[in-house]
């Protein structure tokens, strides 16, 4: 009887471990943090940065993709998020220009490979694509979850705000990168500020290639992600997204949180997602 009990306990432990590994969950946030610019006056970075960090720490994502971060903002965020490592470079090359950086929890997530490419006809070098106003980049991180060793790939991007053709072609640059690197069968997250509404062609193309969790986790009005620092915004544009492939999404939400003084931490709303690997 004692041997039988030990056998049953061993089986139950094995099943428990197997289930835990098969349902390993990670969380991610995409967040355009708004660049540091004095013309924002009351909404300038120095007035927002502490509250923005508090929001991130409260949500506690395993992976954080940010857009529009200048080098001084990257330095501040990196110093505040001590449990995270950062990958990415400025859109003008090296430490220059805005980052579309990815932060990841070093104790839970292992970095396997990273690269940055430009959304242009010459993705390997700093460059402006098509009718874009500015250099635009995508940061790629190939990661594995430490306890399960399960691999996943994150694309964090910021599309141009002016160039319609550039936004359309930016999707194809990302899709080509996925195909050329044989990522198509892997667990993929594509996220960022795409400066496009759901009915625009770039988002329709992304929705045809990936899953849009928003569909299965409806957001009550205001359903958008761009508040423009407007305090009474009732109907925000949805221009920030998280798309997934080969992943089960268990939670998706927009984080409508304000600072103690009732101002927004950024002119964009962060998006939170939780997935089973």
Spans of model-derived segments:
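Short, solvent-exposed loop/turn elements at domain surfaces
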Residues: 35-42, 66, 112, 164, ...
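N-terminal, active-site-proximal structural segment of metallo-dependent hydrolase catalytic domains
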Residues: 2-5, 16-80, 91-97, 172, ...
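Active-site metal-binding loops of divalent metal-dependent hydrolases
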Residues: 32-33, 157-159, 193-194, 269
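Acidic/histidine-rich helix-loop elements
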Residues: 30-50, 119-133, 160, 227, ...
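Short, Asp-centered acidic motifs that coordinate Mg2+ and/or phosphate
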Residues: 26, 62-63, 152, 187-189, ...
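Active-site neighborhood of phospho(di)ester-bond hydrolases with catalytic His/Asp-centered motifs
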Residues: 65-67, 88-89, 189-193, 212-215
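Structured beta-strand-rich core segments of catalytic domains in phosphoester-bond hydrolases
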Residues: 63-151, 155, 254-255
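Metal-dependent phosphoester-hydrolase catalytic domains
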Residues: 108, 165, 169, 176-188, ...
